[in-house]
């Protein structure tokens, strides 16, 4: 019997059920990875974002409400995580550029 997403989230949140979390990851990894890849255009960065999003899910599972649509929550979280990653990448590139232009 396939459980719905929120049942699996509750199972993970209350019992730290690894099988429940694994099922959630298997169901949604394609959505999360493709959204991250579409936003960043970088396969390696998309993999990092995908891992980060599922870590966020693990940490916040207990806070998700009964009306949460998990796929929408994951997509939104992926978009935010990708935007943050791209900002960090731009800041790092700017610092490196500044260090190159202004040697000590």
Spans of model-derived segments:
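N-terminal module of bacterial RNA polymerase sigma factors
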Residues: 1-30, 97
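Sigma70-family region 2
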Residues: 13-14, 38-43, 51-69, 88-94
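Amphipathic, Lys/Arg- and hydrophobic-enriched alpha-helical face
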Residues: 18, 23-43, 60, 75-78
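Short, basic/polar amphipathic helix motif occurring as a linker/hinge flanking DNA-binding modules
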Residues: 1-2, 47, 63-65, 71, ...
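Conserved acidic
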Residues: 8, 16-24, 45, 49, ...
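Conserved adenine-binding aromatic site and its adjacent loop/helix in ATP-hydrolyzing domains
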Residues: 55, 76, 97-101
């Amino acid at each position: 019997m396939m459980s719905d997403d929120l049942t699996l989230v509750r199972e993970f949140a209350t019992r730290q059920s690894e099988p429940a979390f694994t099922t959630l990851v298997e169901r949604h990894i394609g959505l999360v990875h493709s959204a991250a890849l579409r936003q960043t255009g970088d396969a390696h960065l998309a993999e990092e974002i995908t891992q980060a999003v599922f870590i966020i899910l693990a940490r916040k599972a207990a806070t998700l409400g009964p009306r949460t649509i998990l796929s929408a929550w994951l997509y939104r979280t992926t978009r935010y995580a990708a935007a943050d990653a791209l900002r960090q990448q731009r800041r790092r590139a700017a610092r490196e550029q500044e260090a190159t232009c202004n040697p000590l």
